Regions:
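Helix-loop-helix "hairpin" substructures at the membrane interface of multi-pass membrane proteins
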Residues: 112, 195-272, 296-297, 301
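Single transmembrane alpha-helix segments in multi-pass membrane proteins
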Residues: 33-42, 46, 50-110, 123, ...
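Transmembrane alpha-helical segments in multi-pass inner-membrane proteins
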Residues: 252, 257-332
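Short loop segments and helix-boundary regions at transmembrane helix junctions
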Residues: 11-20, 40, 83-92, 113-178, ...
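Transmembrane helix-bundle core of multi-pass membrane transporters
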Residues: 148-219, 272, 326
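Hydrophobic core segments of alpha-helical transmembrane domains in multi-pass membrane transport
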Residues: 22-38, 75-79, 100-106, 127-132, ...
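Cytosolic-side transmembrane-helix boundaries in multi-pass membrane proteins
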Residues: 1-28, 34-38, 211, 231, ...
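Interfacial loop-to-helix junctions that mark the boundaries of transmembrane helices
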Residues: 14-21, 53-67, 91, 116-121, ...
Length: 349
């Protein structure tokens, strides 16, 4: 066979890769959004220019985007793993909230007693809080037969009510204009990744978590069991894979990662617990996991894409008056195009 005969086949194969379809989906979302901007009487190129400048125009803006991406990555990886194992976990929002609450309790109470050890203690508390909240949902699903979508969605609202109760009660700062706790002691703050900046080590933790999740999913027996359970219940059953163990394990991992996301947000960005501190993070994590086609490593660029879109949109709104909510259109269209592209690719196979 000649090189000329091979080349067209290689080009077709390259164009049919999942990565190419995802990139093309994002491009199409930008094109369609650009048409909507044009219909509104604005220049889409100018709008996108301000988004890019707002996200990358200065180092402080880049820092904001990286800090925002860290919890997105952590929660997104957890959701991606659950969806891979056919566990429809919609509860990352609540797990983040409980993780942030648990970390805040330790940061406030333990600063004087634990000293420098309060930071790792607070992070562990956040992880345990998120894991416990996820475990409750898994237990209800497995013991009472209530579908995980319903359980996890309802528990999101309960989690935020619990956080609100603490902030309006014993943990709330007196005479504050907003429901929040007092500022944490410096020893409870996440270390900075770059000196004299606000960039904390959360982004490193998130990237490492995504890499570890990839290794577990594709290089361990546990990961194989999760993938098998997600691919076929019958195949998993005949292979001796326990669905209950898979569901509980995946929910625990998701709770650990989401709890860590909540802890990182309160210890590294706000330095206190604030009502609504991560509102929408869990649902963004679902979109990020789907945009990444449930691949833990792909969650990294997907989370960065979401985070920098959101930070850049504020600049666009200030400069040319286009609402920052436009990024929701871009995110939504990207997700729709990706899901369509993935489904089309699956039918071809």
């Amino acid at each position: 066979m000649t090189v000329a005969a091979i080349a067209p086949t290689q080009r077709v194969a390259w164009r049919n890769t999942l990565a190419w379809r995802v990139v093309l989906s994002v491009v199409w979302s930008l094109v369609v959004t650009g048409i909507l901007i044009l219909m509104a009487g604005k220049n889409p190129l100018v709008a996108y220019q301000h988004i890019v400048l707002g996200a990358f125009g200065s180092w402080p803006r880049v820092v904001v985007g990286l800090n925002k991406a860290a919890p997105y990555m952590l929660a997104g990886v957890g959701v991606a793993l659950c969806f891979r194992g056919n566990v429809a976990n919609m509860g990352a929002e609540g797990q983040i909230a409980i993780g942030g609450l648990a970390a805040s309790v330790v940061a406030l109470i333990g600063a004087s007693a634990l000293g420098a050890a309060v930071l790792p203690a607070a992070l562990i508390a956040g992880v345990l809080g998120g894991a416990a909240w996820a475990a409750i949902a898994a237990a209800i699903n497995l013991t009472r037969g209530v579908h995980e979508v319903l359980v996890t969605l309802m528990m999101n609202f309960i989690a935020w009510l619990i956080v609100a109760e603490f902030l309006h009660g014993p943990m709330g700062e007196i005479d504050a204009g907003f429901p929040q706790t007092p500022m944490f002691e410096n020893v409870a703050w996440l270390p900075k990744l770059v000196a004299r900046t606000d960039l904390h080590i959360g982004i490193v933790i998130a990237v490492l978590a995504a890499i570890m999740a990839h290794v577990v999913l594709w290089r361990t027996v546990t990961g194989f069991h999760w993938r098998l359970a997600g691919a076929s219940d019958k195949a998993a059953h005949y292979a001796g894979v326990s669905r209950a163990r898979s569901v509980f394990g995946l929910m625990l991992v998701s709770g650990v990662l989401s709890g860590m996301a909540g802890a990182i947000e309160v210890l590294g960005v706000h330095y206190r617990l604030i009502e609504g501190f991560s509102l929408g993070f869990g649902f963004n994590a679902i979109a990020i996991a789907l945009l990444a086609t449930l691949k833990p490593l792909w969650v990294i660029p997907a989370a960065l894409f979401f985070a920098f879109l959101e930070t850049g949109a504020l600049s666009m709104q200030r400069q040319i008056g286009i609402p920052s909510s436009l990024v929701l259109v871009i995110q939504g269209l990207s997700l729709i195009f990706v899901l369509c592209a993935v489904g089309r690719g699956a039918r071809r196979v």
